[in-house]
Amino acid sequence: MKFFSVSLALAACLSMAAAQGLDGLPDCAKSCATNSIPASCGLDVKCICTDSSFISGISCCVLQSCGPDQQQEDAHPFFPTAAVEFANRICKTAGVTNMPQSPSCANTTQSATGTASKSSTATSGSSTESNASQTAATATTSTTPPTSPTSPTSTTGSTTSSAASTTNTTTGAAVTQHKDIGLIALAGAALAAFGLLA
């Protein structure tokens, strides 16, 4: 009975520590922490901590999402470092200790591709035309001389151009309803382990 009480008290302390973990971060950093979790890992702490995009995702997000006033507070002198320290604390519980010790933000890349074309044909004064938007063009025109004095002149031309369209894609894990669910699950696992020992 005494061992059960100690286990319950330990679980309560772990739950309180987990709840205080995210409370030390501003709201912008909290969303960065939850949005940086790789979708393929779910709530598996070891998987999250061994995924290289996790730490860089948190650091980069905090640098982009949090204003200077939220990066500078009495409790945390520089929030990206605090976010990295937060991730290091969580990962250490899963036995992962080779985490980066400073924030980083890799440059983002964008790709642009697309095509558009324009063609025109004119014969004996009638004209048909098909258009798409264009930014630059090259044209080729050929003229065929008439074969008899009564045959019309035919001119054909084609214009081809390329247009650009930009697509940005952002991926990340869905925000969980309860941000501290991973730490609470860890506390529950610890409680279960203590219960099995009894």
Swiss-Prot record:
Disruption phenotype: Increases susceptibility towards the chitin/beta-glucan-microfibril destabilizing compounds Congo red and calcofluor white. It comes from Aspergillus fumigatus (strain ATCC MYA-4609 / CBS 101355 / FGSC A1100 / Af293) (Neosartorya fumigata). Residues 20-119 form the CFEM domain. Glycans are attached at N107, N131, N168. Residues 108-168 have a biased composition (Low complexity). GPI-anchored cell wall protein involved in stabilizing the cell wall. Not implicated in virulence, heme uptake, and biofilm formation. A lipid is attached at G172 (GPI-anchor amidated glycine). This is GPI-anchored hemophore cfmC. The lineage of its organism: Eukaryota, Fungi, Dikarya, Ascomycota, Pezizomycotina. Residues 173-198 form a propeptide. Its main location: secreted. One of its GO terms (cellular component) is side of membrane. The CFEM domain is involved in heme-binding and contains 8 cysteines and is found in proteins from several pathogenic fungi, including both human and plant pathogens. The CFEM domain adopts a novel helical-basket fold that consists of six alpha-helices, and is uniquely stabilized by four disulfide bonds formed by its 8 signature cysteines. Belongs to the RBT5 family. Pfam families: CFEM. Residues 99-168 are annotated as: Disordered. The GPI-anchor is attached to the protein in the endoplasmic reticulum and serves to target the protein to the cell surface. There, the glucosamine-inositol phospholipid moiety is cleaved off and the GPI-modified mannoprotein is covalently attached via its lipidless GPI glycan remnant to the 1,6-beta-glucan of the outer cell wall layer.
